[in-house]
Amino acid sequence: MNIIRRASSIFDKLIVCVMVNAGKNPMFTQKERVELIRRVTGDLPNVEVDSSNELLAEYARRRGSCVVVKGLRAVSDFETEFQMALINHKINPDLDTMFLTADSQYMYLSSSMVKELGAYGVDLSDFLPTEIIPDFQERIESRKKQF
C-alpha cells in the first residue's frame, strides 16, 4: 500500500494491475487479490484495480498507459526490475518505468515473511492493512488444516 498511496499522489489516474507470475505461489487467487486491493484502496478515488494474464507491456499498451511504477525494497529488487523495465520498453517503446523505494519501515518485508509470521500467530497490524488481516488469517488457518 505504501507504493500505491505514494504513486496515487503523483498521477491523476493509477491503475493497479494484478498479474500472474508463474514463478510464485500466491496465497490468494488473482480475483481474490483484486478484491482485497480494491478494499484497501477504496479511499483513493483515482485508483483503479484491474487484472490481466497478458504481458505487462502489452497490457499497458492496450490501456494507453505510458508509465509503470515499481516498488523497490532492496538492491536485489532493482536488478530484477531493471531487467524487466528494459524488456518492457523493448516490447513497448512508449512505456517507461518509474522506481519508488519503499519507506524504510517496509524495506525488509516480503510476502513469504508475512505469511510465516501469520502462521505463528504474530500480530500482523504492522505489516498489512487492517481491512484485510481477517482474510489473511482465515487463509492461513485453512492452509494449516490441509497439512
Model-derived features with residue positions:
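Nucleotidyltransferase catalytic core that binds NTPs
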Residues: 1-147
